[in-house]
From Swiss-Prot:
Highest taxon of source: Bacteria
Protein name: Large ribosomal subunit protein bL9
Family statement drawn from the similarity comment of this UniProt entry: Belongs to the bacterial ribosomal protein bL9 family.
Entries under HAMAP family matching the protein: Ribosomal_bL9
Protein task: Binds to the 23S rRNA.
Record flagged with keyword Nucleotidyltransferase: no
InterPro entries named among the record's database cross-references: Ribosomal_bL9, Ribosomal_bL9/RNase_H1_N, Ribosomal_bL9_bac/chp, Ribosomal_bL9_C, Ribosomal_bL9_C_sf, Ribosomal_bL9_N, Ribosomal_bL9_N_sf
A Gene Ontology BP annotation from the UniProt entry: translation
Gene Ontology CC annotation, any one: ribosome
Keywords for this protein: Ribonucleoprotein, Ribosomal protein, RNA-binding, rRNA-binding
PROSITE patterns: RIBOSOMAL_L9 (PS00651)
GO molecular function: rRNA binding; structural constituent of ribosome
Amino acid sequence: MKLILTQEVTGLGAPGDVVEVKDGYGRNYLVPRGLAMRWTRGGEKTVDSIKAARASRAVRDHDHAEQIKTKLEAQPVAVKVRAGAGGRLFGAVTVTEIAGALADASGEQVDKRTIVVTNPIKSLGAHEVSVKLHDEVSAVVALNVIPA
């Protein structure tokens, strides 16, 4: 099934990309959630308009992403969590908690889907997470997990 992506889909593409996916994935997941629309000959105009809008935002977004990166990397971010004896956490620190802590510390709203945690954070102390702000800009944020 040929689709036009209307939003970024991890591992598949960016808005405006024409992709070929299995029928069930397109029909049951991508299209109902508004992540893609069916490809038609008239849809080529939609692709062109999406790509033109994306190109015009690219330079502005890159500069803005650099500014946010500077803010995020300037200071460590503290996340308060419940912990047991020995510094072991009850569960793991989620990307939602990290996004909230980043918003509190820097004043910038960061989408939780852009936060990349390589290993689950299950202990107190210093950790690092990366935030993909733009195709070419990633920020490595120092995260300090402290007991609540």
